[in-house]
Amino acid sequence: MIESINGKLLKEMFISGANHLQNNKDLIDKLNVFPVPDGDTGTNMSLTIASAIKELKTIKSDSITDLGKALSKGSLMGARGNSGVILSQIIRGIAKSIEGKDQLSVEDLAKALKSGSDTAYKAVIKPIEGTILTVVRESSDFAVKNSKKAKDCVEFMEMLVEEADKSLERTPDLLKNLKDADRKSVV
């Protein structure tokens, strides 16, 4: 059981997540129908997170604050397309929330995701439901609601991924472009 996450583990989590995104970028590209079906969402998000990871790897410290700042800077500087900019804002909100912490509990992770969601929504002039914004908002709401019940960070993250998948499944009901295309979306 992992009750809290230190900087070293946080770094490993982001690197693993970036690898997972890279390995699935083609699938995500196929989900892309909004705002235009140009099929580049996975590629743009992958390039954005790769820039964040490149910056992360320049940090010698395992300080959560330093890691968060590096991820935020790298993702913003390397943001590609709408989805990349939104991802960079999610990371920015997460980084701001974890600043000053030595360890991250389940509740800290939930609050960080909520901060990421809120930051991303504020960055978009006209947020549209049925997009990546919806998935991160619904996931963060679930995280905050359930964070007091969970103690194991791994179990909590697994529940969170499951909830994000459910949210993604609901996106066609929220966005006309998706209903017309009969698909799921991430942007």
Model regions and ranges:
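N-terminal loops that bind phosphate or other acidic moieties
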Residues: 1-185
